[in-house]
């Protein structure tokens, strides 16, 4: 009843893979390595391509069910939430999650989010947020342009 499926997820690197765990044919959990993180996505410094990463995220991760569990390769949650809160300061879910992290040692605690939580706190999945677009001054930009702008801003963060 359990199946582990290998998914080709280029972008962070051109050969990146994720592992999707299915239960009775339905997505249950994904092990994302460095492609997708709590509140963020991977960088493209090691031979990756941000445009391909956009395609991977927009065609794969956005289609997963809300209850899918996400196991990233390692933790950037606090830093990623700081980025989200800076560029989307009216994101109440991200602000609340940041409050939840106060006093938490992320070297000892690892958060396993669901896709639903990620859709609320992950700036790279919120490319239609009016508050984000206004903050970035990209109200007329395509989702791809917004993603690429965010990826470049996150590279400098």
Where do the PLM segments sit?
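Catalytic core of the metallo-beta-lactamase
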Residues: 1-86, 145-149, 155
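Accessory terminal helices/loops
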Residues: 55-69, 77-157
């Amino acid at each position: 009843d359990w199946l582990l499926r290998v998914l080709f997820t280029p972008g962070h690197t051109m050969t990146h893979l994720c592992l999707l765990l299915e239960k009775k044919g339905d997505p249950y959990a994904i092990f994302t390595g460095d492609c997708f993180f709590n509140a963020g996505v991977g960088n493209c410094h090691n031979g990756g391509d941000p445009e391909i990463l956009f395609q991977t995220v927009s065609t794969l991760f956005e289609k997963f069910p809300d209850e899918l569990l996400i196991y990233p390769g390692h933790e950037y949650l606090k830093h990623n939430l700081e980025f989200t809160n800076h560029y989307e300061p009216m994101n109440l879910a991200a602000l609340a999650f940041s409050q939840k992290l106060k006093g938490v040692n992320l070297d000892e605690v690892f958060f396993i989010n669901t896709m639903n939580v990620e859709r609320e706190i992950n700036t790279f999945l919120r490319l239609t947020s009016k508050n984000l677009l206004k903050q970035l001054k990209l109200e007329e930009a395509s989702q791809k342009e917004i993603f690429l702008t965010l990826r470049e801003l996150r590279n400098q963060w």
